[in-house]
UniProtKB/Swiss-Prot annotation:
Pfam families: ABC_tran (PF00005). This is Galactose/methyl galactoside import ATP-binding protein MglA. It is an enzyme of class 7 (translocase). It comes from Vibrio vulnificus (strain CMCP6). Keywords: ATP-binding, Cell inner membrane, Cell membrane, Membrane, Nucleotide-binding, Repeat, Sugar transport, Translocase, Transport. Its EC number is 7.5.2.11. The keyword Repeat applies.
Amino acid sequence: MVNQTHEFLLEMTGVSKEFPGVKALDKVNLNVRPHSIHALMGENGAGKSTLLKCLFGIYEKNEGNILFLGKEVNFTSSKEALESGVSMVHQELNQVKQCSVMDNIWLGRYPKKGFFVDHDKMYRDTKAIFAELDIDIDPKVKVATLSVSQMQMVEIAKAFSYDAKIVIMDEPTSSLTEKEVSHLFTIINKLKEKGCGVVYISHKMEEIFAICDEITILRDGQWVDTRPLKGLDMDQIIAMMVGRELTHRFPEKTNTPKDVILEVENLTALNQPSIQDVSFELKAGEILGVAGLVGSRRTDIVETIFGVRERSEGHIRLHGREMKNRDAHEAINNGFALVTEERRSTGIYGNLDITFNALVANVDEYKTQMGLLSDKKMKSDTQWVIDSMRVKTPSHQTHISSLSGGNQQKVIIGRWLLTQPEILMLDEPTRGIDVGAKFEIYQLILELAKKNKGIIIISSEMPELLGITDRILVMSNGRAAGIVNTKETSQNEILELASRYL
């Protein structure tokens, strides 16, 4: 598939990019070999996205050279890059959902028979690509009917159809099950066998060690190092990424659980399949983890408690008082807060500033007697969120979408703390966040527990649950399979419980 006359398929050398007042990239290098999977790592804000935008012509670089197959290139669009053999599978998949799979692959370059589209050839060509990549999807079904992992496979097949030499994958496993991740890795390895160079961007260290051959690390817009992965360990990579040694992945636990403040008894959601007969207690100052396989209905628990999912039976008691929580507004007034899993779609208002995003859950607090909003109080509370959550931002007016994932998440947590909750529920709070920012969010969570908040954390990352929680509620197929003390349990025990009702 790929002509191997060059040591590197892609050579980005000394690439710099400046924005007004900010040097986003400062002489960055990225060299990708054929037959290799190359990890590109760095904290959010390290410059990974900016570097790739310079490659695809979305940003114009200020200096540096880009060689592709030995020739200097300056792509002016993603389309030009794709047609030349450089493809990107995005975290947010850009597909025409109401069109068929094969339409999405051949869009804009349909095979023709006379004046008409040759659907038979399009079908045959799609089937041939799928067979080569071991993809089992009907080319004629609508993309809207596919799972996220299948949509990603369609994107990879599209890159393959363009005879891509470089395939860039941005956080490809963020929404996949373990089985789907395993299948994706098989397909990525097939691309490697055929001579492609795959650039793999992920915050998941385990994946980097499982699949990658080389690694390039960026920090604060600068190139730190490029090395073979063999011989490196996790601590060395983290130290290069953050510029200091993180001696522990998790802060020291200094919270002390006290009296029970929340009792959940026989909680069952109205619209099944969902949670059934779930019971647990939560103490003041306690961090309770919720574990389970994908599809175990972990999120349904916090949604039902928060009133966004209707319950058919069960009791929620806070300090012994029965809580109805018929909707989110009532739940907020009763002292509950929920940081949702999908930060981009249900957490932030991307085209609005930090002030709006920090205060939106608490607007009534800023109304004066005349019904106007108090600018002074709004400024003061926004500053409180920025200071107490340690948000890195130029100003209150900065659009939240321009912040790194870790800083966006801190603003969301700060937003809910302004409502003065007693129970804070966090669904996948560190998904898509780099290792340094994760540590800061763990610190914030522990500080809140020390202030006697009751905290519930849902996470798919087992080390996270074992590193930060006091107890873990394990869900299996919508039912509580057991509650374990974190200090006394193991990954194997949790996985056994998670399979109990399958």
